[in-house]
């Protein structure tokens, strides 16, 4: 949905404890988490009209966000297993 934030705690509520644990213990996860959070914030600002960019730029940012989300989800599942 346009303008909706996609932070990981809302996307994966079942992993809230795991997200917190990995942010504290896994530097790679923490870096990807921070990158995802910043990117999600940027996409949200663009979608709500706070920033103006081309449609191509927005789509590229969304694809990057999705790629990061997939990586983070894989790490969450692996840790929970």
Where are these regions (language model features)?
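Extended, charge-rich alpha-helical interface modules
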Residues: 1-81
């Amino acid at each position: 949905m346009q303008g909706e934030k996609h932070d990981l705690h809302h996307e994966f509520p079942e992993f809230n404890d795991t997200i917190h644990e990995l942010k504290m213990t896994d530097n790679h996860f923490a870096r990807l988490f921070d990158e995802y959070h910043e990117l999600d914030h940027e996409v949200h600002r663009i979608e709500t009209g706070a920033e103006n960019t081309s449609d191509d730029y927005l789509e590229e940012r969304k694809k990057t966000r999705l790629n990061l989300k997939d990586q983070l989800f894989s790490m969450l599942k692996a840790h929970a297993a």
